[in-house]
């Protein structure tokens, strides 16, 4: 079996401006933040992003990397809850927003994973969701009669096809098999299966034998057929949680949100945390924690 290990920047070097990317995780939980920071270091722009959003989306918006977003929500999960950079991009019109129900996003990923053009869903009917889609979102009439007679109209959720997807898990092997050791898979497997290029980071790369002995079978969420490249990235989800390896860094998340409130504060944040390598970032975060 091939060894799929690579480096963060080498993985991101495969992106091109204008691509559609999926960012797995959920809000401020197990986000592939090391990959996000690598995208910030790149020249890639004009991205369409598909996400259950958190600071991953906020950071990309802060750097002007995003053109359009398909999202079920955007949340930091704890105070101040709403990501400041996404809020600015959304309200200023800097991005095209395709807001939807969480189930609709999952349905779109499922359609893409199954290589279907769309899947029917009731979510979104009777709501203002279609108004956010600029005519993209269509309905379909069921060819089968409903139990009470008549033919039901449903949302035809389009496949959310991804040029590339990024996910972060706790444990993996060099071939791309991986497991989560926390409490929730966060649909990470769907993001990977919906994509043409699949990139995974993990807290630790271990031997396959150790991987399968470390977790119950149902936690082996990702297999090697879903992954093109894997990166060992300790702290790769920071400042989101990657429990049980570490929780959300609440102090740093507040620091991020507060820094975004002024131009000077944000320039200092970028200089301190986002202008160097991933190793530089982790060292700066260590210094931040030591000073508190």
From Swiss-Prot:
Listed EC numbers: 4.1.99.-
Pathway: Steroid metabolism; cholesterol degradation
One of the protein's GO biological processes: biological process involved in interaction with host
SMART domains: CoA_trans (SM00882)
Pfam families xrefs: CoA_trans
Family matches, as Gene3D superfamilies: 3.30.30.40, Glutaconate Coenzyme A-transferase (3.40.1080.10)
Alphabetic keyword roster: Cholesterol metabolism, Lipid metabolism, Lyase, Steroid metabolism, Sterol metabolism
Reactions catalysed according to its record: (3E)-2-(2-carboxylatoethyl)-3-methyl-6-oxocyclohex-1-ene-1-carboxyl-CoA + H2O = 6-methyl-3,7-dioxodecanedioyl-CoA
GO molecular function annotations of the record: CoA-transferase activity; lyase activity
Uppermost EC category: lyase
InterPro entries: CoA_trans_fam_I (IPR004165), NagB/RpiA_transferase-like (IPR037171)
Effect of loss of the gene: IpdAB double deletion mutant does not grow on cholesterol, but grows as the wild-type on glycerol. In the presence of cholesterol, ipdAB double deletion mutant accumulates COCHEA-CoA. Double mutant does not survive in macrophages and displays severely depleted CoASH levels that correlate with a cholesterol-dependent toxicity.
Family per record: Belongs to the 3-oxoacid CoA-transferase subunit A family.
Known function: Involved in the final steps of cholesterol and steroid degradation. Opens the last steroid ring of cholesterol by catalyzing the hydrolysis of (3E)-2-(2-carboxylatoethyl)-3-methyl-6-oxocyclohex-1-ene-1-carboxyl-CoA (COCHEA-CoA) to 6-methyl-3,7-dioxodecanedioyl-CoA (MeDODA-CoA).
Quaternary structure (record): Heterotetramer composed of 2 IpdA subunits and 2 IpdB subunits.
Protein name listed in UniProt: Cholesterol ring-cleaving hydrolase IpdA subunit
